[in-house]
């Protein structure tokens, strides 16, 4: 799920914290990519006639095709990707995982009805809702990455937290994922849409953490509390408090503890035994492998191994796999030239021209910051 409504909130309140970029501008950059999120995208997007790709044996291959060609696209543009795989989920995520299981059950029932009614569009929609990344998908992608010469990391817990750790400690330039909670984990730079297909023509969105805090006028602790109020994977949020109210409350009262002292809990019911403090600790002190203990090594692809696995075992065209291997090898030696700015000190918050909201526009940052002092207070 990530953080509910955070991307829109940033667009409304901190537009200068994000800029759009082209993939070619990341030449020479190392990027830690959330593997599970990418594989999920591939399983949903890489399809034929609305169905997941399979080989002659009926095995799903959408994830392998997506991983192979999207990774080649990145490497071809000089990017050095490292994929980070999820470990065991934290105990606090059990509630969110249970909700996802319930939603899949509902989608399965809806799919059966749509199939009976012959509603093709609904069938396609509910099929996608049933998609789940399995251990087998992960294992097959790890094998493929090894043959491609691309490193991967097994996170002890959440992949987003591990990506943030690698970025914060300078092991990579940025964390690449669609889950906004990588910002809550404190990554200095986040990239969205990096693994999207070229055909979608979606620009890469680059978010800067330091600039985000500055434009929101929040500390790291206040930003984490804001994300918990918006809704995260680790606990429920307060019903009735959306993004607009959440940021106003955090700006006014500075912490969830103070907010709880002042809001009308009849109007805004607080979840029973709300473990917001445990969620906060999880974001501040996630279980990760320290960046200095992670070794990243990019090597030449194993062309023979790729042909054996992808063509002979999985049914992909041998010529296409060989062409892909050549692209990987050529691009790897080109990208070793590196970036000019790698020889100089890199500033944590690049100079980005701030996108000022239109003059007099509703919801400008200055207007959002002003509020009635007793707006959310308990009735006397």
UniProtKB/Swiss-Prot annotation:
It is found in: Nucleus, Nucleolus; Nucleus, Nucleoplasm; Mitochondrion. Mg(2+) 2 binds at residues 179, 181, 233. This is Flap endonuclease 1. The keyword Methyltransferase does not apply. Its EC number is 3.1.-.-. Binds 2 magnesium ions per subunit. They probably participate in the reaction catalyzed by the enzyme. May bind an additional third magnesium ion after substrate binding. Mg(2+) 1 binds at residues 34, 86, 158, 160. Residues 1-104 are annotated as: N-domain. HAMAP family: Fen (MF_00614). Residues 336-344 are annotated as: Interaction with PCNA. Belongs to the XPG/RAD2 endonuclease family. FEN1 subfamily. Transmembrane segments: none annotated. The gene is FEN1. Pfam families: XPG_I, XPG_N. One of its GO terms (biological process) is DNA replication, removal of RNA primer. It is an enzyme of class 3 (hydrolase).
């Amino acid at each position: 799920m990530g953080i509910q409504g955070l991307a829109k909130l940033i667009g409304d309140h901190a537009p200068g914290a994000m800029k759009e970029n082209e993939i070619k501008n990341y030449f020479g950059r190392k990027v830690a990519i959330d593997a599970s999120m990418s594989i999920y995208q591939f399983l949903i997007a890489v399809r034929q006639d609305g169905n997941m790709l399979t080989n002659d044996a009926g095995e799903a291959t959408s994830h392998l095709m997506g991983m192979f060609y999207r990774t080649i696209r990145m490497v071809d543009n000089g990017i050095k990707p490292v994929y980070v795989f999820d470990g065991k989920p934290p105990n606090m995520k059990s509630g969110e995982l249970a909700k996802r299981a319930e939603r899949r059950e509902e989608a399965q029932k809806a799919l059966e009805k749509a199939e009976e009614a012959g509603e093709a569009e609904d069938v396609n929609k509910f099929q996608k809702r049933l998609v789940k990344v399995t251990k087998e998908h992960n294992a097959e992608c790890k094998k493929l990455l090894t043959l491609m010469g691309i490193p991967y990391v097994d996170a002890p817990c959440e992949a987003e937290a591990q990506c943030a750790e690698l970025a914060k400690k300078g092991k990579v330039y940025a964390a690449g994922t669609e889950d906004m909670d990588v910002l809550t984990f404190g990554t200095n730079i986040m990239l969205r849409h990096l693994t999207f297909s070229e055909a979608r023509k979606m620009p890469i969105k680059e978010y800067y953490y330091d600039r985000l805090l500055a434009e929101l006028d929040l500390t790291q602790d206040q930003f984490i509390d804001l994300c918990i109020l918006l809704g995260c994977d680790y606990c429920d949020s307060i019903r009735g408090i959306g993004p607009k109210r959440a940021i106003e409350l955090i700006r006014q009262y500075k912490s969830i503890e103070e907010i709880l002292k002042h809001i009308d809990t009849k109007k805004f019911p607080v979840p029973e035994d709300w473990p917001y403090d445990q969620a906060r600790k999880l974001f501040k002190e996630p279980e990760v492998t320290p960046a200095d203990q992670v070794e990243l090594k990019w090597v030449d692809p194993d062309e023979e191994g790729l042909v054996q696995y992808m063509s002979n075992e999985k049914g992909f065209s041998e010529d296409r796999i060989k062409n892909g291997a050549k692209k990987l090898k050529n691009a790897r030696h080109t990208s070793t030239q590196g970036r000019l700015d790698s020889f100089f000190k890199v500033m944590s918050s690049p100079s980005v021209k701030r996108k000022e909201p239109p003059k007099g526009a509703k919801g400008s940052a200055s207007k959002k910051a002003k509020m009635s002092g007793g707006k959310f207070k308990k009735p006397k």
